[in-house]
Amino acid sequence: MAEQEASGLQVLLHTLQSSSDKESILTILKVLGDLLSVGTDRRIHYMISKGGSEALLQTLVDTARTAPPDYDILLPLFRLLAKVGLRDKKIGRKALELEALDVTLILARKNLSHGQNLLHCLWALRVFASSVSMGAMLGINGAMELLFKVITPYTRKRTQAIRAATEVLAALLKSKSNGRRAVNRGYVTSLLGLHQDWHSHDTANAYVQIRRGLLLCLRHIAALRSGREAFLAAQGMEILFSTTQNCLDDKSMEPVISVVLQILRQCYPTSPLPLVTASSAYAFPVPGCITTEPPHDLPEEDFEDDGDDEVDKDSDTEDGKVEDDDLETDVNKLSSKPGLDRPEEELMQYEVMCLELSYSFEELQSKLGDDLNSEKTQYANHHHIPAAASSKQHCYSKDQSSCGQEREYAVQTSLLCRVKTGRSTVHLGSKKNPGVNLYQNVQSNSLRRDSSESEIPDIQASPKADAWDVDAIFCPRMSASFSNSTRTREVVKVIDKLLQTHLKRVPFHDPYLYMAKARRTSSVVDFKMMAFPDVWGHCPPPTTQPMLERKCGVQRIRIFEDIRRLIQPSDVINKVVFSLDEPWPLQDNASNCLRFFSKFESGNLRKAIQVREFEYDLLVNADVNSTQHQQWFYFKVSGMQAAIPYHFNIINCEKPNSQFNYGMQPTLYSVKEALLGKPTWIRTGHEICYYKNHYRQSTAVAGGASGKCYYTLTFAVTFPHSEDVCYLAYHYPYTYTALMTHLDILEKSVNLKEVYFRQDVLCQTLGGNPCPLVTITAMPESNSDEHLEQFRHRPYQVITARVHPGESNASWVMKGTLEFLVSSDPVARLLRENFIFKIIPMLNPDGVINGNHRCSLSGEDLNRQWLSPSAHLQPTIYHAKGLLYHLSSIGRSPVVFCDFHGHSQKKNVFLYGCSIKETLWQAACTVGTSTILEEVNYRTLPKILDKLAPAFTMSSCSFLVEKSRASTARVVVWREMGVSRSYTMESSYCGCNQGPYQCTQRLLERTKNERAHPVDGLQGLQFGTRELEEMGAMFCLGLLILELKSASCSHQLLAQAATLLSAEEDALDQHLQRLKSSNFLPKHIWFAYHFFAITNFFKMNLLLHVSPVCDT
């Protein structure tokens, strides 16, 4: 049958070419038209494959060459060619070979006064010009001159032909040669004039497509440097800017405004950033490295512009896909285990990091109380591992009880009650019940200072609530000589009064201890100040915050404002009000501009420029010893007025996209709010967008290549109080000093009879800061051989975090993990009794301290140094890897290794793991995969977390091994230590668009009122610190269930877990009944039933005395 159809079509096409009978030709054209008018494009492609294009073109040439040409045949022929040509990518080449190109051009010239005939010719020329090379050929043959005869000033006649002519001209101008020809012949001015004329007369917007066609011509010309120069010389920026200002809100004008925006952005002159140098404002002399002169920015003429277009996109193009050509396909590299990168005898030094393997219970007891409140030994050679004496164990007496009470209160509800159900952790605002205050029961003695920590830095503030001068609240660091002065005692009294008057108790935080710790934190430029939020502390807000709904056109408005600066420079103040590169001070307290400051721990703001009265351009600092990685920001701002929107434009961001385009907001901390009892980082800002700007890096900095692009993050903030002091940050800050304070408070809070908690110094960093290593497990029940044997043979779990300083969310997740592991939660107790946790909570302290986003003080990404780290340049990575080597060498490789990270391009929380087979399958390298033996247990933990953790999603997890990730912790620990469950856990800076956190507060209120079901595709909730800490605790729960599902799980642990689950089942059932009775959040009810299925699974396995089967 197919052969008959093919032969029938071929007969028709052959007859069409060979027949000279008009009626036969018209009949065949009608039949072909009917065949192609129904069905899918497959019919057109089929006809093309059988020579349909050639047949139509040949008929066109033959008919056109008859005298006179028969337009009864030519018009339907042109219509068919227009339809077929849209699907035939080679139509232009075929037309050239069969001389149809010239024939059509001749026919168009002959029909300038015949509207319908000309229109059909233009349709054919449009498809021929779809090929750039054919468009160039048409330009050589005078097509553009012809088209300019068709495109006239505003008229209501022959508008179809004029529209078609603009479309053909736009296609021709894709050719660079045609573009240059248009510039040389002055067509840029002509096109601008035509557009102005049509715009001014077409008040009803009836001919928007003609105006768009004219603009497309200009856009293609502007792709050339000469075209942009001609456009600017013809005042094109001013003309297009003014013609669009009155129609920005008109939806019918969207096609025009979109192209105008592209042209204006394309023609905006590129310029260097307003910085002295592209290098960081801070420099650190790296041992053994020669310091080079940082490259300085060059004048504008040094900048190349690639002329790329950028459309105002609102679609989420998060970079979740791995390029197949980056996948590792070498089976030997994937499956082989490299040798040690250091002498084997060197691993012995890490025994001091595993004292739990050698302590007897008597030795451990004798150590308790030793070195009370002593400082960690400071080592002159920071590349050597400290001796065992530097360990800090359970060394605090029971009278330090307040922190324990904080912890007990915070975890009195078991973690099992907060799994992926309609849990209380989605804290929604309510006037009747604002939610349980986790901080009311914290006793005031949590702020008590030890006598050894009397050297308290200076906080200056008025303690009177009615006479606040909050801009005077600052926290300078103090030298040792000054700290003993009378002034210090006076300041301490002020601090005490201020804290007693205003402080809201923050669990696991002590301002006095923080200030004492801050004095011992070493920074590159020796910061003299501390940020108020870090000293005062942070409490999670009582309610969650939904993702910001982005209003249509926000980005467009901000770009037009950028363009206004160029064409109306008199409106721009352009005053530098803060700069790390300029002499201090630049700001006058009496001036009416905002005051900025960032020279404190983790702070990052390099320069602030006042653009307009309430608008500022900001530039963030590059990483120390680097010219890159501008993303993290954290700075103080004061001198504001309330109820006025201030616009901030961070103009030197590097990433091509950001979650700020998809619902994310920066964070804000108000000092006045904190003194009113709300010490909280909140998401803030409106009119947020992220887009490419006109700044470029110079070719000198880029090493001779075309300079990279920069992007602008813009947002507006309406401050809650006038003359407040506020802090703005990319994400919730978490400093190194906060970590060291937190660890000490945790150490004081543990129950010495139950929890084995020890701090070691893994090493000293390049900057001279100790990198902490924490060990957590359960104390042995007694000093009997049996109990000590069980204590020493517990499997290890290794968790690390914050290798990238800007990923502060990783530290909040780690905070949740640490607090949960030392808590009295029954799940935490089971975990301590069955595992030893080795935790390195901050792998890059120097980067965190100095406000870096990605690198250490050496200017290197430490998570790309795991293959062969240097003890001198990357000490934390070198010794972290050494510790893992040591555990592997004694047969104690961790069950799970996980490195906590933050992700700037995707939502939710997810894991990256490693799999040989999945990598090869994805790369389509299936040869030999059948012989590769690989366990599938690497998928078990992600599946567990997907069922338990509200923020986690399995759909974003990946187990591919990329070449570009070969030197990361995840891949190196997997390959070299043989840890099959080696992961990177990524937490979004933004929030969740799945699971319980998918529902926004506004929708929940509507659902409750209307008894409606939530709809899919919601924006979801932004992460707060509460949700991040919860994820850290849920990760721990996942480790327990992973062990329960393993074939090696002991019957004793199964029995303990069954008892625990039975105790929790009643509470979960009551919670489920409440949800059912209120008909609230049906999805969450499903999650609750799902959790009951999990618990029943473990109980059945216990009753049947069968170990659970590994998840496949």
Curated annotation (Swiss-Prot):
Disordered, as annotated region: 291-345
Protein name (Swiss-Prot/TrEMBL): Cytosolic carboxypeptidase 4
Cofactor(s) needed for function: Zn(2+)
Positions with a binding annotation for Zn(2+): H804, E807, H901
Tissues where this protein is expressed: Expressed in corneal endothelium.
Principal subcellular localization: cytoplasm
Family, similarity comment: Belongs to the peptidase M14 family.
Key words, A-Z: Carboxypeptidase, Corneal dystrophy, Cytoplasm, Hydrolase, Metal-binding, Metalloprotease, Protease, Zinc
Entry's Gene Ontology molecular function annotations: metallocarboxypeptidase activity; tubulin binding; zinc ion binding
EC number in record: 3.4.17.-, 3.4.17.24
Biased composition (Acidic residues): 299-329
Catalyzed reaction equations: (L-glutamyl)(n+1)-gamma-L-glutamyl-L-glutamyl-[protein] + H2O = (L-glutamyl)(n)-gamma-L-glutamyl-L-glutamyl-[protein] + L-glutamate; C-terminal L-alpha-aminoacyl-L-glutamyl-L-glutamyl-[tubulin] + H2O = C-terminal L-alpha-aminoacyl-L-glutamyl-[tubulin] + L-glutamate
Designated gene of the protein: AGBL1
Main function: Metallocarboxypeptidase that mediates deglutamylation of tubulin and non-tubulin target proteins. Catalyzes the removal of polyglutamate side chains present on the gamma-carboxyl group of glutamate residues within the C-terminal tail of tubulin protein. Specifically cleaves tubulin long-side-chains, while it is not able to remove the branching point glutamate. Also catalyzes the removal of polyglutamate residues from the carboxy-terminus of non-tubulin proteins such as MYLK.
Residues annotated as the enzyme's active site: E986 (proton donor/acceptor)
GO annotation (BP), single: proteolysis
Pfam families in the record: Pepdidase_M14_N, Peptidase_M14
